[in-house]
């Protein structure tokens, strides 16, 4: 008997690089993240691209969270250290 070995029949398209730069804004990161989630959820990505997309998504999510925390901290400073409850007018 011959031992099994994995042979790739076709090369998958290049996966997004995990060294992509941070987005320029929260809005750009959110838009890229939404598009990425759509591609992943479609089920049409090869496994390698799905993994790379997941990794990029984690980077984008961390970027968005950091920006939101920074804005929240700035609001606390403007509100004298206490985050005020939102009251819709």
From Swiss-Prot:
Enzyme group, top EC level? Answer: hydrolase
State the reactions this protein catalyses.
Exonucleolytic cleavage in either 5'- to 3'- or 3'- to 5'-direction to yield nucleoside 5'-phosphates
Q: Which UniProt keywords apply?
A: Cytoplasm, Exonuclease, Hydrolase, Nuclease
Record-level GO cellular component terms: cytosol; exodeoxyribonuclease VII complex
Which purpose does this protein serve, as stated in its record? Bidirectionally degrades single-stranded DNA into large acid-insoluble oligonucleotides, which are then degraded further into small acid-soluble oligonucleotides.
How would you summarize the oligomeric state and partners of this protein?
A: Heterooligomer composed of large and small subunits.
Name of this chain's protein: Exodeoxyribonuclease 7 small subunit
Taxonomy of the source species: Bacteria, Pseudomonadati, Pseudomonadota, Betaproteobacteria, Burkholderiales
């Amino acid at each position: 008997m011959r031992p099994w070995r994995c042979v790739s029949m076709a090369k998958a398209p290049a996966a997004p690089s995990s060294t992509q730069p941070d987005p320029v804004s929260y809005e750009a990161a959110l838009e890229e993240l939404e598009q990425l989630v759509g591609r992943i959820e479609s089920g049409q990505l090869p496994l390698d691209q799905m993994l790379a997309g997941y990794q990029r998504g984690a980077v984008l999510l961390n970027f968005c969270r950091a920006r939101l925390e920074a804005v929240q901290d700035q609001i606390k400073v403007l509100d004298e250290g206490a985050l005020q409850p939102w009251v819709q007018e």
